[in-house]
Curated annotation (Swiss-Prot):
UniProt-listed PROSITE patterns: EF_TS_1, EF_TS_2
Annotated coiled-coil segments of the chain: none
Keyword presence, Metal-binding: no
HAMAP family for this protein: EF_Ts
Gene symbol of the encoding locus: tsf
UniProtKB keywords: Cytoplasm, Elongation factor, Protein biosynthesis
Molecular function, one GO term: translation elongation factor activity
Origin species: Thioalkalivibrio sulfidiphilus (strain HL-EbGR7)
Disulfide-bond pairs as recorded: none
Function: Associates with the EF-Tu.GDP complex and induces the exchange of GDP to GTP. It remains bound to the aminoacyl-tRNA.EF-Tu.GTP complex up to the GTP hydrolysis stage on the ribosome.
UniProt protein name: Elongation factor Ts
Compartment(s) of residence: Cytoplasm
Amino acid sequence: MTITASMVKELRERTGAGMMECKKALAETNGDMEAAIELMRKSGAAKADKKAGRIAAEGQVVVALSDDATRAAMVEVNCETDFVAKDENFEKFANRVAEVVLSGAPADVSALMAQNMDGASVEETRAALIAKVGENVQVRRFERLEAAAGGTLGFYRHGNRIGVAVELEGGDAELAKDICMHIAASRPVCVDETQVPQELLDKEREIFAAQAAESGKPAEIIEKMVSGRIKKYLAEITLVGQPFVKDPDKTVGKLLEGAGAKVRRFVRYEVGEGIEKKTENFAEEVMAQAKGA
């Protein structure tokens, strides 16, 4: 497969590595971008997958809560520009969609779009909004939480771009909000080690083993190094293993233990995460216009 300059450029942006290192990795993986990144991580050539999880789309994350605070719905609605994201009509639509999710409990986005909202379907209302604001509008995803008996729901919004909802077993509203704020800031992958996907753990172990092998140390030392790195990795990605943002001397797990509470589940949305927006090259655009003039 031919390795193009644009492929090398993308890999450089995602890893922070040099041009020749990127070209070599792409050649060795026959142009497979993800495989090249993994290969470079194993060899230590990749500084970080900088592009992964990059926020690119605009819109809002909104939350609706039932009057008795036992049910919550969180929705992400996307548009093309920050200007429209702040538009009153767009904001009203996003909030009404969250209310429909809360009351109607649709199974998925397709079912949601067919539900009634103020005399028309959500899809029809979306189409009307597109005509009004002049931009594409998409209801991307939603989550609905319902507290079990004796449970507590909490939510937190950081501006209009980040939303977190959490369900606690035990605890109170203040603790739930503190946990939500922590999740917003620290981005845990899951609640605890039991929820870490085995595939993800195996992949990280393989990468850590390849990195440790570069040291040339004996196998038993390498195994200890890998175990230590896995332990640190799990503490970084699990909610209960992370240092609590308001008191870094204790973990979230210890905070919950002291309050006699557990986190059943949480949801964290950030506007546009995982969606890549087209990058405009204004120099090329001006050149094209000049040639056409």
